[in-house]
């Protein structure tokens, strides 16, 4: 009722879709989801956000059985090729075997695209920018902006793990990509503190 009054839009159960975006910024809104299910089940409600695992760490309990979760992941190499209209190449890669390898020119093309994918990563905005013909530099700027926004969000969820610890471990993982992760050099902290920060980053899908 209050939302209807604020936005001057009627909310009609069964017809209106209520969308809570960036819900990770409001712990109270996350807590309210279970009550919508229990007290207002006829209303269609969708919530979206990033680093939700960080926010959920702040809650004593979450609406188990009352909230259905859907996870969105970065692009896979297959999806990257499809976005670049290289479905034929992906089909050829799938059919290739050690006995029936790709022809050298096709193999070189696949490796070039793989290298670009490894540089760009799989974030949708970055891939969309690349597909639209933007330069690699433009794509890297978007990646920098995404990293900054993630780090800004770290500060909102620091009850369990200090923000500085999460940032240190996050930076260490990025700087040592492709190398074995060594706890001793990850941050100025003990094993337990580093593991807590790393576990949180893994749960958030920022580290795999």
Which residues does each PLM region occupy?
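Short glycine-rich substrate-engagement loop in P-loop NTPases that contacts/grips substrate
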Residues: 1-14
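Conserved P-loop NTPase "ATPase switch" module shared by AAA+ and STAND
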Residues: 11-29
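Structural recognition of the conserved hydrophobic beta-strand(s) that form the central parallel beta-sheet
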Residues: 19, 44-50, 71, 80
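Conserved RecA-like P-loop NTPase ATPase core
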Residues: 21, 33, 80, 121, ...
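Conserved catalytic/switch belt of AAA+ P-loop NTPases
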Residues: 30-47, 51-53
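Short regulatory helix/loop adjacent to the ATP-binding pocket of P-loop NTPases
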Residues: 35, 53-69, 81-86
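Conserved AAA+ ATPase core "coupling" helix
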Residues: 73-95
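Interdomain hinge/linker elements that couple catalytic modules in large macromolecular machines
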Residues: 87-208
